[in-house]
Amino acid sequence: MRRFAHKFVLIVLGLGVFALPSWADTHIYAGALGTNQNDQLFFSNGGGFDATASSYALPQILRTNGLNTGYYRGDALTFSALAGTIPNGGPILGHAAFGSRLAVQVVSVTGPPGGSFAFWEGDGESDLGNITFSVPVGTTNGTDYLLISENNGEPGADPYGHFHGREFTASAPGTYIVGFRVIDLSTNGVGGGPIQSPSDILPVRFQAGLRIETIQTFTNRVTVSFRSPPAISNVLEATSAIGSGTWLPVAGPLRGNNNLQFLTETNPPGVNRFYRLRLLNNLP
């Protein structure tokens, strides 16, 4: 069995500078640019997650216990459909047409060779312990989807939906970019088709496994940046000889928060230096 104590990322600092190229329960909201026939769906806050416009990544760590053992998973990511009625917390500007039934489709996946990106359905509180669908790296025209509207497609129904207990995982360490699209599954449009047209594809970056994103050297300190899921404590360790097996903690521990964070070693010796991040705990 793998042990989380051996999971770390490594960076080497020689003479000079060497660099390797908060949201909790994160929500991405789906709605529409209009409510007439063929008006386009969209992700209302998608700009904050667009991998082409930002370096932001949703961090995932290898789970060593619980339902997702053996897979990389981060904090919960929830896709929600904006409400159109008062009982569901609406009307919210940008909601889809009444009678639409929204789903999020996984269209494309890039990432490490042999890897895959999977969706786990939930019961409202936690995932059900089985992969609902898995999309391999290299996919460019995926059709798998998860329903996000809490209706049955009846005419006039509120498109609202907010499901908890769902999870997304990666099967191998590395950086993934997953293309998501909102589609309308209803048959309440012209000719028995959907009301709304599909959204543009939103590319979202996931980082499976701890990774030092940047390293900066100053006169009296070295600072590294990284991302980690909430409730995971991380420590920066260093050694002057990688073959010695002697790693000493030099900064932290620091609990993750899904956002870019920093750990700093002050007054490091002016010699070759090796760094790694190590997580101190794991979650189910």
Question: Where in the sequence are the language-model features?
Answer:
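Bacterial N-terminal signal peptides
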Residues: 9-19
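Contiguous segments within soluble domain cores/interaction surfaces
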Residues: 25-165, 181, 186-209
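Short, hydrophobic beta-strand segments
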Residues: 166-171, 265-267
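Hydrophobic residues positioned within well-ordered beta-strands of beta-sheet architectures
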Residues: 166, 178, 202-204, 224, ...
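Short tyrosine-centred short linear motifs in exposed loops/low-complexity segments
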Residues: 171-180, 232, 271
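Short, composition-biased motifs enriched in small/polar/acidic residues
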Residues: 209-284
